[in-house]
Amino acid sequence: PITDGCRPRTKAEIRALRSYAQDLEADIVALQEVGSIAALGQVFPPSDWQLFLSQRPDSETYECRESGRQSTQQKVAFAVQNDIEVLGETDFTALGLDNPGLRHGMELTVSTPLGEMDILNVHMKSGCFEDDFSRSDSEACQTFARQAPVLDDWIEAKEREKTPYLVVGDFNHRLSSPYNKLSMLMADNSNGAKSNLVNATASLIGCHPYYPAPIDHILMGQLQSPALIS
């Protein structure tokens, strides 16, 4: 894994990533654009972490900008501390729309001091940054428009079941915008019940000088206030 990809990581970079992962002091880490379990294990040692990788079939590789190097796979993954009980894992294939070029999501069910929780890790279609994706005729937004109700259906199911849940990952979309259509869709339960969905990252601003609005988010729902505080 260290020698693969468009720009292979150096040993020093791997050490830096491993150090960063330790400094997070996180129990569960959701990742995107992971090539393999072996690559994941270089940053999250299996002696300390349970590693989970999407079962999405490998997509066709391509040459990276005439460099002579071949791309690696892009799959979602989880690293979970060994003392956390994982009760189940499911590939969320519906997000791929039966298109081999689109990423699957991945769902974990974990045991917490407050009960079971479902965590969905997503990496949605890139290239659609319109607040209202339905008003764009770009291929990216048309694809995103098909993924949006799939994600909303998953959230609505958890809302109906009153199951504590998180949705995390790379949405490739500025959900914190006040007129974002996907945010409004997810916050509106079709049965008329009040939504418990909260975007925990809504107030954050990125440090990139040209792209300050984040596209990576942490959404949560059906959590009691002690869970939010902790």
Question: Where are the language model's segments positioned?
Answer:
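Beta-strand-turn-beta hairpins that frame and shape the catalytic cleft
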Residues: 83-86, 100-131
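N-terminal, active-site-proximal structural segment of metallo-dependent hydrolase catalytic domains
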Residues: 1-50, 56-68, 73, 148-152
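Metal-dependent phosphoester-hydrolase catalytic domains
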Residues: 98-101, 112, 153-166, 172-230
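Active-site-proximal beta-strand/loop segments in catalytic clefts of secreted hydrolases
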Residues: 32-35, 54-57, 81-82, 90-92, ...
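Acidic/histidine-rich helix-loop elements
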Residues: 1-12, 127-143
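Conserved beta strand-loop-helix elements of the APE1-like EEP
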Residues: 35, 67-89, 111, 210-228
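Active-site beta-strand/loop signature of hydrolases that rely on acidic residues for catalysis
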Residues: 20-41, 79, 108, 119, ...
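Active-site-adjacent helix-turn-beta-strand microarchitecture at beta-sheet edges
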Residues: 40, 48-108
